[in-house]
């Protein structure tokens, strides 16, 4: 999970219990993380780090699910600056779907589920990534 200006540790203790649907989003996050290979995609394009430099990349995807958890629409709402990383984020959500048993309370008046998902690729000597909602 990425939080600006918060050091990474074993756990980030937030008031998660007040988030009604955290279990669903944790499942979504785990499914997407299994598919997301931004570090591999990045290293294939820039194995030495000389092309794109050492700059962390952050993008967000606006996700719309059908009531059964299948993907209806994906939209890159914040670009990372590298199209191939944004494409990888979209691909990973598509491949991870469907997201079974979405809570009824997440459905909007249109019967669809809308949320934004973030992808943070930390570029150091060895790229690392974090996925968050």
Region locations from a protein language model:
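Conserved "boundary/linchpin" sites in short secondary-structure elements
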Residues: 1-12, 30-36, 66-78, 87-101, ...
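Charge-dense, E/K-rich amphipathic alpha-helical interfaces
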Residues: 6-9, 47-51
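Short loop/turn motifs at secondary-structure junctions and domain boundaries
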Residues: 42, 50-57, 110
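Short hydrophobic beta-strand micro-motif common in sensory/regulatory domains
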Residues: 59-61
């Amino acid at each position: 999970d990425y939080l600006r200006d918060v050091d990474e540790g074993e756990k980030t203790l937030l008031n998660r219990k007040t988030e009604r649907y955290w279990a669903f989003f944790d499942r979504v996050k785990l499914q997407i993380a299994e598919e997301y290979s931004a570090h591999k995609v990045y290293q294939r394009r820039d194995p030495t780090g000389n092309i794109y430099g050492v700059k962390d990349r952050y993008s967000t995807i606006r996700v719309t699910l059908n009531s059964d958890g299948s993907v209806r629409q994906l939209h890159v709402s914040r670009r990372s600056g590298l199209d191939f990383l944004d494409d990888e984020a979209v691909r990973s959500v598509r491949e991870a779907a469907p997201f079974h048993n979405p809570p009824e309370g997440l459905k909007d008046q249109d019967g669809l589920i809308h949320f934004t998902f973030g992808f943070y690729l930390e570029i150091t000597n060895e790229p690392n990534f974090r996925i968050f909602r």
